[in-house]
Amino acid sequence: MASVEYLIKQFLTPDKKNLDLSNQNIGDKGAITLSKSKSIKRIKKLMLPNNNISDEGIIAIVNSENFKNLTDLDIYGNVISDDGVKAIAESTYISNLKKLSLYGNLVEDDGAIAIAESKILSKLKHLYITSNRIRREGIEALKNAKCRTRLCHLHVDDLEDFFYEEDQDYDDADLINSWEELKARNAEKGESED
């Protein structure tokens, strides 16, 4: 992997407002280096898909004053979980964010709820959060946020796509919990033990 500073020089647009580091595998170390770079203070659009960035890396980015002008953050296909998304939802440095792509990360309900309830992300209009681990509670929180606030373009997985139901009347009488219970059941059925 090339150094992050070299990649910035190669891929930062001449107006210094857009940086596309897609598929560069910069990881957390590279994300931390990026967050400290003096070259990106005017950046508005940051594209970091498929870079193996986890919570540590995204937390460094969203807590950097260098990203105070950021309006578009594309971090799909990384390994960002709820902690990273909560940092996004709580960071005052990225309060100008209008578009956020979290497609294909490790976000669960808590992360989705953090975005839905965020007071800081008041300008967010486009959210791409499909192909994560978000279930009913998170999806409903996001859909409710869309109805009452700013999310004009929300892309989440459909609830109908999930085929899970908690069966409250599940009869576990057939479950065997110990070796002794198995032997006793076999004896009741007249089956012999070898």
Model-identified regions with their sequence ranges:
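Short, solvent-exposed loop/turn at the beta-strand->alpha-helix junction
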Residues: 2-4, 24-32, 52-59, 79-86, ...
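C-terminal capping region of solenoid repeat domains
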Residues: 6, 16, 125-126, 133-194
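Alpha-helical adaptor scaffolds
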Residues: 49, 56-66, 72-94, 101
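Inter-repeat linker/turn residues at the boundaries of leucine-rich repeats
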Residues: 14, 38-41, 65-68, 92-95, ...
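N-terminal segments that cap or nucleate solenoid repeat domains
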Residues: 1-46
